[in-house]
């Protein structure tokens, strides 16, 4: 690992930047992140790079160009990571009894947070850059961190990108605690880094006048570097690790089954005592059978063995492969801590059974939520604020059972709480419903009609009570 202390030992800032990028691009974490991006796009490397090899007469391996080469890549990696990310971040984040924090973070914070958490999972770590009023996400494949050897904290960082690495110009931004500097490197002229603009502060002081419009009159910085790491779990590693082999096994077996169906003739013919027929004669004979579905054979030989024609069918093993594929699929979901929705039918499962099915997913979500809370609180500390992030997880429920439970408790709850607990009531409709109920209740009281204490009739209450 190339640390901040290693960077300081470089001959110059430009040499340190180039060394840091070069070391980062050959690290195992970077290579794993690149693989994770490919699996995330269903471009699974193992099955896509697979070729069938046979041995020639000399025993040397050669590519079998005549064999079927179907490459069926599964989409497990994207689906499982998306499931966890949507489960935890799908409803955004709120802050207990402090709406000012959410307003300060901006209306795009929830979507940026979901992206931040997703890349933290598939890469092992992702970095959030706070640009005055908006959060930007830096992936591990485009950001080289410079960590302090003694504290492990981020002291500086280098973001790098190019439309075509090695052919198009490389754009580089060097982030330090007291500002950032932009560089560019032309691959056709492998000279020193060219400074595009000198170091600038992270916060610009702008003065607006009718004559000149907005004019930058000064700069300022935060108390530290405004880049916060979020780790995918306490292991600080990609979710591809430990999952890749199971996905590859599933892909190879599934693709191999398709290739066997193409390579193996399901019906073939054995023609006996017709050795004098040439290849062309055999092909013509087979064509006549396919066309006429009739063949003649001399079964009464004159002192010689008679000829015969016998069809054979071939069946590809199916049951064993299907059972093994199902076993691997179950293992992938179990090891990943995901929810297999095929095992849940909300119409037939009780709330307790559904809750039990979410156990593994809840544990994985807890691990990611802990890391997300740490990252968000570090961001709030940078902004001089304090707050506790709260996540409302989205899960499958038995709506009929939950409605029944809520209505049984309605006598002890106020109107707004009842509406918030009902699963079939949209959140944005609650205020509108409460307002209409106030008008309705007012009309009822004017007509001297009896009104329940909380405004809700309980359909589960016995008429005799």
Task: Indicate where each model-derived feature is located.
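Conserved aromatic-histidine-acidic binding/catalytic patches
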Residues: 5, 39, 64, 116, ...
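Extended, helix-rich architectural segments
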Residues: 1-138, 460-465
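Extended, charged amphipathic alpha-helical segments
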Residues: 209-349
């Amino acid at each position: 690992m190339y640390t901040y202390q290693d960077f300081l030992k470089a001959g110059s800032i430009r040499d340190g930047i180039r060394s840091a990028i070069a070391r980062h691009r050959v690290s195992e974490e970077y290579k794993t992140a690149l693989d994770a991006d490919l699996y995330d796009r269903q471009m699974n490397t193992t099955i896509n790079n697979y070729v069938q090899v046979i041995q020639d007469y000399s025993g040397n391996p050669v590519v079998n160009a005549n064999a079927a080469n179907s490459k069926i890549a599964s989409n497990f990696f994207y689906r499982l990571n998306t499931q966890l990310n949507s489960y935890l971040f799908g409803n955004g984040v709120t802050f207990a009894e402090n709406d000012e924090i959410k307003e300060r973070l901006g209306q795009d914070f929830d979507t940026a947070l979901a992206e931040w958490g997703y890349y933290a999972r598939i890469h092992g770590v992702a970095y959030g850059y706070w640009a005055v009023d908006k959060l930007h996400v830096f992936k591990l494949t485009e950001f080289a961190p410079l960590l302090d050897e003694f504290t492990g904290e981020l002291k500086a960082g280098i973001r790098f990108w190019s439309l075509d690495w090695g052919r198009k110009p490389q754009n580089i931004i060097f982030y330090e605690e007291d500002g950032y500097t932009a560089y560019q490197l032309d691959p056709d002229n492998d000279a020193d880094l060219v400074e595009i603009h000198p170091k600038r502060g992270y916060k610009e002081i702008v003065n607006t006048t009718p004559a000149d419009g907005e004019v930058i009159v000064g700069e300022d910085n935060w108390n530290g570097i405004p880049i916060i790491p979020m780790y995918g779990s306490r292991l600080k590693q990609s979710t591809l690790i430990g999952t890749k082999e199971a996905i590859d096994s599933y892909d190879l077996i599934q693709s191999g089954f398709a290739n066997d169906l193409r390579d193996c003739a399901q019906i073939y013919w054995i023609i006996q005592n017709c050795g004098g027929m040439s290849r062309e004669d055999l092909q013509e004979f087979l064509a006549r059978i396919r066309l006429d579905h009739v063949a003649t054979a001399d079964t009464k030989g004159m002192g010689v063995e008679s000829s015969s024609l016998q069809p054979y069918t071939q069946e590809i093993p199916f049951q064993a492969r299907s059972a093994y594929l199902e076993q691997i699929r179950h293992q992938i979901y179990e090891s990943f801590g995901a929810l297999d929705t095929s095992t849940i039918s909300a119409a037939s499962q009780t709330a307790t059974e559904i809750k039990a099915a979410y156990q593994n997913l809840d544990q994985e979500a807890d691990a990611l939520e802990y890391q997300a809370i740490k990252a968000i609180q570090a961001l709030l500390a940078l902004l001089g604020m304090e707050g506790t992030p709260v996540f409302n997880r989205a899960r499958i429920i038995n709506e009929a059972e939950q409605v029944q439970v809520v209505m049984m408790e309605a006598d002890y709850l106020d109107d707004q709480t009842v509406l918030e607990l009902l699963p079939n009531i949209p959140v944005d409709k609650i205020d509108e419903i409460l307002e209409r109920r106030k008008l309705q209740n007012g009309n009822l009281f004017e007509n001297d009609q009896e009104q329940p204490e909380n405004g809700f009739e309980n359909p589960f209450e016995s008429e005799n009570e």
